Regions:
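Short beta-strand-to-loop acidic/aromatic patch adjacent to the donor-nucleotide binding site
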Residues: 59-70
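Short, acidic, metal-binding catalytic loop of nucleotide-sugar glycosyltransferases
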Residues: 20-33
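Active-site-adjacent helix/loop segment of glycosyltransferases
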Residues: 92, 97, 165-259
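Active-site acidic Asp-centered loop
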Residues: 36, 65-67, 155
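Acidic/His-rich active-site region of diverse nucleotide-sugar glycosyltransferases
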Residues: 49, 69-151, 165, 179, ...
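A conserved hydrophobic helix/loop-capping motif in glycosyltransferases and polysaccharide synthases
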Residues: 2-11, 18, 25
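Glycine-rich, basic loop-to-helix element that forms the pyrophosphate-binding segment
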Residues: 38-54
Length: 263
């Protein structure tokens, strides 16, 4: 049995489809849905609520996935088998396939994580091998419970984005590996945790990225762990942080204007 945690928000058809695919897996899956319609704690806190539910139970692995992630029927079994045969792997990720073209991979491993995430992508035939990667996309990742007990849960200073890459960097800094598992696949519709391009949602994303920069980009560790870390000069980091803070101020003003107009 492998528990699966789904942060849910405002799309019943996506959730029903996601659950249907989990129920059709070749290994048993226990499903925990954190209903953010009821009270929206956003992605990171929702995931942590599920992790804490299962952390003291005798499961080897915990699966995290978005409501718009639809796993092939052998995906969970393949991920668990890979983790069994790679004891140093703390986090595993399947190939995420384009919802309109399942022969195209939209996530095969993280590249840059800051200021916005960029992923390895391309035709499916280019990603036939398992590979150690820098970070996994939080739309679907399997976590080793032993690792969670060592490094803790996700950092809730992130609200909507960034906690997945942050968690992978934290794991790798403690000696754990992150892998893409090529034999495990799923369709990803994209955008379930933060699809609306509203000022308040965009503001949350900006704040998450500012926090990521403040946490990781002030020392040499991130350069060692990140994609093309040597190119992250202090001047570049300073410029990007200034741009993010400017964008934050503009979005805060937009949000204030919306509130004022609604009074």
């Amino acid at each position: 049995m492998i528990p699966a945690i789904i942060p849910y928000y405002k799309n019943k058809s996506q959730l029903a489809r996601c659950i249907s695919y989990l129920e059709g897996q070749t290994v048993p899956v226990e499903i925990f849905v954190r209903d953010n319609d009821r009270d929206n704690v956003y992605y990171t806190a929702a995931v942590n609520e599920g992790i804490k539910k299962y952390l003291d139970q005798p499961y080897k692995y915990i699966l995290i996935l978005n409501q718009d992630m639809y796993l092939e029927r052998t995906a969970v079994e393949r991920m668990a088998a890979f983790m069994d045969s790679h004891p140093d792997c703390g986090i595993g990720a399947p190939l995420q396939l384009h919802s309109g073209n399942p022969d195209y991979v939209i996530f095969a491993g993280g590249c840059e994580a800051f200021p916005l995430g960029r992923h390895q992508h391309g035709p499916l035939q280019e990603f036939t091998e398992d590979k150690e990667i820098l970070w996994a996309n939080g739309a679907c990742m399997i976590l080793r419970r032993e690792m969670i007990r060592e490094i803790g849960v996700l950092d809730e200073n992130y609200v909507l984005i960034g906690s997945d890459s942050d968690y992978c960097f934290a794991a790798r800094s403690r000696g754990w590996q992150v892998w893409r598992i090529a034999g495990a696949r799923g369709i990803h519709e994209c955008g379930a945790s933060g699809k609306l391009c509203e000022p308040n949602v965009e503001l949350l994303k900006i704040k998450d990225m500012i926090y990521f920069g403040q946490k990781w980009l002030t020392g040499e560790l991130y350069q060692e762990l990140s994609h093309k870390g040597a190119e992250l000069t202090p001047e570049w980091v300073s410029q990007v942080m200034n741009d993010l803070q400017k964008a934050q101020a503009e979005l805060e003003q937009m949000c204030e204007n919306v509130v004022t107009a609604g009074r």
